[in-house]
Amino acid sequence: MLLTFFYAANSFAQTEEAKCFSAFNELRGSYLKAEKQMTVSVSNSSGMTLHRLLHIYKDNKSISYWENLNGEIRGYALKGDVGFDFNQDKEYAGPLTWHQTLIWDRLFNSDTDLTGFSCVLTGRTRVAGQKVSLIRLAPKDSYRYGYLIAKDDVNAMPVELAVLSPNSGIITKITVNSVSPVDGLNLDLSVFDNLSEQNSVNNKEENSFLEIWPELNIPKEYKLVEEGEIDDNGVLVPYQLFSDGLTTFRVYKNAKTSVVIPALTNGTISILRKSSGDYEYAVVGEIPILFAESVLSDLPR
């Protein structure tokens, strides 16, 4: 009798999770082919910022153009997983850096693998005036961010994304405040093809021989995807970049300095510094601060 009850409960849980992932994949499909202009607010402990998001569908990929509405006309453009930063006021275009909204782009990209996450439909409510269903994506480990998504009951589009800490506190909330048709995207789309080709060549040259620094404690969900150096006032500082397909972080290894502020957080972005021997290590990226501490936990004192 007890075994029968256990198997029945397990079967029910698997069925409910399958329904949840089906609802989430429906949202991804709707978002992929949406051609919309949205006003989006991003709020966290540092305050709130407003953005304009232009989203179109091209070559079976989602193209997003995020523009800051606070001050300078700046932001980033993304096609699939290829993108770049821009600042129209300074006539600048350069490598893609971290942005709070990149988690939105990657999470709703149908190519992002969510193996290692469980899915639960937690109910219905209203968000930004819309009737929504709530989808909770929780990591099966204890160190990554979780996600609570509000899905529009009418058009299956995302209305809000809350990024959750490992203890379920809200780190950052991304909310769609208004939606309208796209007026037009003034962007040369060939730049994405050039970037994609360049990245493909670089990855073939680099990823075949990369090895994780042995002093780091990297969870199995994260892969080493890039290694390089940055110029810090004339000093070349080596780094390694890790990703689980949804979030990324870098580890820098520099000459030892006086660490004044060992840890900082800004929404989903954490920075942690730690000295070991003659070196100072810095973990920077879209991970909780406790996760960053774990990455450096094996360093000798």
Question: What does each model-identified segment do?
Answer:
Residues 48-52, 142-147, 159, 171-173, ...:
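Short, surface-exposed coil-to-beta transition loops
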Residues 30-33, 55-64, 76-82, 130, ...:
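Short, solvent-exposed coil/turn segments at beta-strand boundaries
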Residues 128-196:
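Gly/Pro-enriched, hydrophobic low-complexity segments
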Residues 5-61, 69-72, 114, 124, ...:
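N-terminal leader/targeting segments and the immediate start of mature chains
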Residues 89-144, 153:
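Short N-terminal edge-element motif at the start of the domain
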Residues 32-37, 60-65, 129-136, 157-160, ...:
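Short, hydrophobic/aromatic-rich segments at coil-to-beta transitions
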Residues 43, 49-105, 160, 165-175, ...:
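An acidic-aromatic
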Residues 194-277, 290:
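Short, solvent-exposed recognition patches
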